[in-house]
A protein has these predicted regions:
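C-terminal (or distal) subdomains of carbohydrate-active enzymes
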Residues: 1-297
Length: 297
């Protein structure tokens, strides 16, 4: 037996024991920064969903921002208890119960891997029924020098905010599965098989952005939207679970490599009791093929 020695990542924690950064050997900056998996709800005081569209479309920038500030309110989840840390042979799992007036039984968890620069995030909550307009977000902050995110839509990569059709939407983006940030020390990749809609620098409601926001390094995944009238139910209560992966890569990575990596992280392992007969080619073909959520948007 050979005793394998590895360079463990440097971790930091807040006063409640939640992890605020993780940096592996060879990285100048951490994989993520303080605020990982913070949960936020945008509330709307105006129950008329259609009025939001009128404000967005027909007011000038100053009027629009003033009006949205008047009718909206942001509310962040708070720690319900100290975070708990459990060590496995290959990782640390940090788990913390959270509380927010709009959900019950909320928990966030991150698994920090020892040998590879990777963090697996899980957010769980039980949404309380309500028809009031509201939007749920999860925050993923990266180092400040992480700029110019790249993503794919329909398998086609492009630089967000730059390589877009003029006057197309820059408030939020529908992605296939991953977002890549380039930095001086390497790339950081955010991926999810559950959340295909993201924004940057904050929530996207009423923004009408023309350029990239100041805090482009802060990614927000939209978990639930009770405001939109298209493709979202007006009220979907009950338990919801979302998974994300944050990884670091040195050197250039092709779109195919990033997609394969992201797909491999959120495909559950399938165990098949193989009979004596040959495997079915159709079953084998689709067994490990992720079904992308973006097809419904």
């Amino acid at each position: 037996i050979i005793d394998k020695k590895i360079d463990l990542p440097e971790l930091s924690f807040d006063k409640n024991g939640w992890v605020t950064s993780a940096r592996w050997k060879g990285m100048d900056e951490p994989l993520f920064t303080e605020g990982l998996a913070d949960f936020m709800v945008v509330h709307f005081n105006d129950m008329d969903r259609w009025s939001q569209g009128d404000i967005y479309m027909h007011m000038d920038e100053v009027q629009r921002i003033e009006k949205f500030n008047e009718i909206t309110r942001m509310e962040w989840a708070k720690p319900k208890s100290k975070a708990k840390v459990r060590e496995t042979p290959y990782s640390w799992i940090v788990s913390q119960d959270m509380e927010h007036p709009r959900v019950k039984n909320m928990n966030r968890q991150v698994e920090i891997f020892k040998e590879v620069p990777r963090a697996k995030v899980n957010i769980f909550f039980d949404r309380i029924s309500s028809i009031a307009p509201e939007v749920f977000y999860a925050k993923f902050p990266f180092p400040q020098d992480c700029r110019q995110p790249v993503a794919t839509n329909g398998g086609i990569p492009y630089e967000l905010y730059k390589e877009q059709i003029p006057n197309s939407c820059k408030d939020f983006f529908v992605i296939d599965s991953w977002v890549k940030y380039e930095a001086e020390d390497g790339a950081r990749i955010w991926s999810s098989g559950d959340v295909p809609i993201v924004s940057f620098g904050g929530h996207h409601m009423g923004m009408r952005l023309q350029d990239a926001p100041k805090k482009e390094n802060e990614l927000y995944g939209m978990l639930y939207n009770n405001l939109w009238v298209v493709n979202f139910c007006v009220d979907s209560p009950g338990e919801m679970n979302f998974e994300f992966d944050l990884t670091y890569r040195e050197g250039k990575q092709s779109v195919e490599q990033l997609t394969d990596m992201a797909d491999s992280y959120y495909i559950p392992m399938s165990i098949v009791n193989t009979p004596e007969a040959l495997e079915d080619p159709v079953v084998h073909k689709y067994l490990n093929t992720p079904q992308r959520l973006t097809s419904g948007y």
